[in-house]
Amino acid sequence: MRIHLTSVLVDDQDKALHFYTEVLGFQKKTEVPLGEHRWLTVVAPEDPDGVELVLEPSDHPAVGPFRTALVTDGIPYTSFAVTNVQAETERLQALGVRFTQEPLAMGPVTTAVLDDTCGNLIMIASPVDPGPAGGAPA
C-alpha cells in the first residue's frame, strides 16, 4: 500500500492552479471537468508519477470553520519537502509569497510556513545540514 493522492482544500481552483504551478513550481497532471468544479491535480516535476496533490474545492460547510481554526492557530494544513528551506523561502518571497513563519531550525529539520492565497497555511521543510562533522561544533 502507498499514498497515491492527497488533497488541499482551496477557495478557487483557478487561483490555486496558478499559485501551485506558477509560484510553487508543481506541474498540472490531471484536469477533468466535474460540473462547476474539476478533478484537478498537480505533481512535483521531478516525480511526475508520484503522489498527486488534489486541488479540492472547499465548498463543504465543514471546511470553513476547520480551516479558519487552523489558520487562526497558525497550524499548517500540510507540508512539502524542499532541499533548502532558507533558499526556497527567499525564492518565494521574491515572487511575493507571504510567510507567517520565517525559517526556523527545529531539531533535525528547518521549517517555514507560507500562505497559499487559497485559504491555507503550508509548511515547507528540509533536513538541517549536519555540516562536515555531523553537526558537531567546529
What is each of the regions a protein language model found here?
Residues I3-H4, D73-Y77:
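Eukaryotic phosphotyrosine signaling hubs
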Residues L5-V8, R38-T41, F80, T89-A138:
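Vicinal oxygen chelate
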Residues D12-Q13, T83-V85:
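Helix N-cap motif at beta-to-alpha junctions
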Residues P45-G50, D59-A62, V85-A87:
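Short, charged/polar surface micro-motifs in flexible loops or helix N-caps
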Residues V51-L53, I122:
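Short beta-strand segments
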